[in-house]
A protein has these predicted regions:
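Acidic, surface-exposed loops and disordered segments
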Residues: 1-123
Protein backbone atom coordinates (compact mmCIF):
# COMPACT_ATOMS: atom_id res chain seq x y z
CA UNK A 1 0.00 0.00 0.00
CA UNK A 2 1.46 3.30 -1.12
CA UNK A 3 -1.22 5.42 0.53
CA UNK A 4 -2.14 7.09 -2.75
CA UNK A 5 -5.42 8.83 -3.39
CA UNK A 6 -6.90 8.16 -6.84
CA UNK A 7 -9.97 9.29 -8.70
CA UNK A 8 -11.13 9.49 -12.29
CA UNK A 9 -12.98 12.57 -13.41
CA UNK A 10 -15.15 12.89 -16.52
CA UNK A 11 -16.73 16.33 -16.38
CA UNK A 12 -15.15 18.88 -14.04
CA UNK A 13 -11.65 18.76 -15.57
CA UNK A 14 -12.98 20.89 -18.45
CA UNK A 15 -13.22 23.87 -16.09
CA UNK A 16 -9.41 24.18 -15.99
CA UNK A 17 -8.23 24.49 -19.59
CA UNK A 18 -4.55 24.66 -18.57
CA UNK A 19 -4.72 21.24 -16.86
CA UNK A 20 -4.27 19.37 -20.14
CA UNK A 21 -3.15 19.74 -23.75
CA UNK A 22 -4.66 18.07 -26.80
CA UNK A 23 -3.11 17.68 -30.22
CA UNK A 24 -5.12 17.88 -33.43
CA UNK A 25 -7.56 14.99 -33.70
CA UNK A 26 -7.35 14.06 -30.00
CA UNK A 27 -10.36 13.95 -27.70
CA UNK A 28 -10.23 13.81 -23.91
CA UNK A 29 -12.79 11.53 -22.23
CA UNK A 30 -11.55 11.20 -18.66
CA UNK A 31 -8.68 12.25 -16.43
CA UNK A 32 -7.21 10.07 -13.71
CA UNK A 33 -5.74 11.86 -10.71
CA UNK A 34 -3.12 9.99 -8.71
CA UNK A 35 -1.21 11.41 -5.77
CA UNK A 36 -1.09 12.13 -2.09
CA UNK A 37 -4.13 14.13 -1.02
CA UNK A 38 -4.38 16.75 1.71
CA UNK A 39 -6.56 14.26 3.54
CA UNK A 40 -6.43 10.50 3.24
CA UNK A 41 -9.17 9.12 1.04
CA UNK A 42 -11.44 6.33 2.11
CA UNK A 43 -12.02 3.03 0.31
CA UNK A 44 -15.16 3.03 -1.79
CA UNK A 45 -18.09 0.80 -0.96
CA UNK A 46 -17.99 -2.39 -2.94
CA UNK A 47 -20.57 -4.88 -4.14
CA UNK A 48 -20.24 -8.55 -3.27
CA UNK A 49 -18.54 -10.72 -5.91
CA UNK A 50 -21.84 -12.53 -6.53
CA UNK A 51 -23.43 -9.20 -7.55
CA UNK A 52 -20.94 -8.63 -10.38
CA UNK A 53 -20.13 -12.17 -11.54
CA UNK A 54 -21.41 -15.71 -11.90
CA UNK A 55 -19.51 -17.13 -8.93
CA UNK A 56 -20.66 -20.77 -9.10
CA UNK A 57 -17.95 -23.41 -9.49
CA UNK A 58 -15.17 -21.14 -10.75
CA UNK A 59 -11.38 -21.43 -10.47
CA UNK A 60 -9.37 -19.39 -7.99
CA UNK A 61 -7.92 -17.16 -10.73
CA UNK A 62 -11.47 -16.08 -11.71
CA UNK A 63 -12.29 -15.24 -8.08
CA UNK A 64 -9.09 -13.16 -7.83
CA UNK A 65 -9.99 -11.39 -11.08
CA UNK A 66 -13.43 -10.46 -9.78
CA UNK A 67 -11.95 -9.26 -6.47
CA UNK A 68 -9.50 -7.06 -8.39
CA UNK A 69 -12.29 -5.70 -10.62
CA UNK A 70 -14.21 -4.70 -7.50
CA UNK A 71 -11.26 -2.48 -6.55
CA UNK A 72 -11.46 -0.60 -9.86
CA UNK A 73 -12.70 2.99 -9.78
CA UNK A 74 -16.11 3.40 -11.41
CA UNK A 75 -18.45 6.34 -12.00
CA UNK A 76 -19.99 7.24 -8.66
CA UNK A 77 -18.74 3.83 -7.41
CA UNK A 78 -21.65 2.11 -9.14
CA UNK A 79 -19.74 -0.99 -10.34
CA UNK A 80 -22.12 -1.55 -13.26
CA UNK A 81 -20.27 -4.47 -14.83
CA UNK A 82 -20.73 -8.23 -14.88
CA UNK A 83 -18.25 -11.08 -15.50
CA UNK A 84 -18.97 -14.69 -16.41
CA UNK A 85 -16.86 -17.72 -17.30
CA UNK A 86 -17.68 -20.30 -19.97
CA UNK A 87 -15.17 -22.95 -21.09
CA UNK A 88 -12.17 -20.87 -20.01
CA UNK A 89 -13.42 -17.75 -21.79
CA UNK A 90 -14.38 -14.71 -19.75
CA UNK A 91 -17.24 -12.45 -20.81
CA UNK A 92 -17.63 -8.96 -19.44
CA UNK A 93 -20.55 -6.67 -20.04
CA UNK A 94 -21.38 -3.13 -19.06
CA UNK A 95 -24.58 -2.11 -17.35
CA UNK A 96 -26.59 0.94 -18.30
CA UNK A 97 -25.55 4.43 -17.39
CA UNK A 98 -23.14 7.24 -18.12
CA UNK A 99 -19.54 6.13 -18.53
CA UNK A 100 -20.41 2.46 -17.97
CA UNK A 101 -18.31 1.42 -20.99
CA UNK A 102 -15.32 3.34 -19.63
CA UNK A 103 -15.95 1.69 -16.26
CA UNK A 104 -16.01 -1.70 -17.99
CA UNK A 105 -12.63 -1.10 -19.61
CA UNK A 106 -11.10 -0.14 -16.27
CA UNK A 107 -12.71 -3.15 -14.55
CA UNK A 108 -11.46 -5.50 -17.31
CA UNK A 109 -7.92 -4.19 -16.83
CA UNK A 110 -8.17 -4.83 -13.09
CA UNK A 111 -9.65 -8.29 -13.76
CA UNK A 112 -6.68 -9.18 -15.98
CA UNK A 113 -4.21 -8.01 -13.35
CA UNK A 114 -5.93 -10.04 -10.62
CA UNK A 115 -6.67 -13.18 -12.63
CA UNK A 116 -3.45 -13.35 -14.59
CA UNK A 117 -3.91 -12.86 -18.33
CA UNK A 118 -2.22 -16.21 -18.99
CA UNK A 119 -5.13 -18.05 -17.31
CA UNK A 120 -7.94 -17.14 -19.72
CA UNK A 121 -9.08 -15.59 -22.99
CA UNK A 122 -11.72 -12.93 -23.42
CA UNK A 123 -14.90 -14.11 -25.14
Amino acid sequence: QLGLNTCWVAVSYKKIKTAYMLDAGEKLCIVIAIGYGKTQGVPHKSKAPSEVADMGDVPEWFKKGVEAALLAPTAVNQQKFFFSLDNGRVSARAGRGFYSKIDLGIAKCHFELGAGKENFNWA
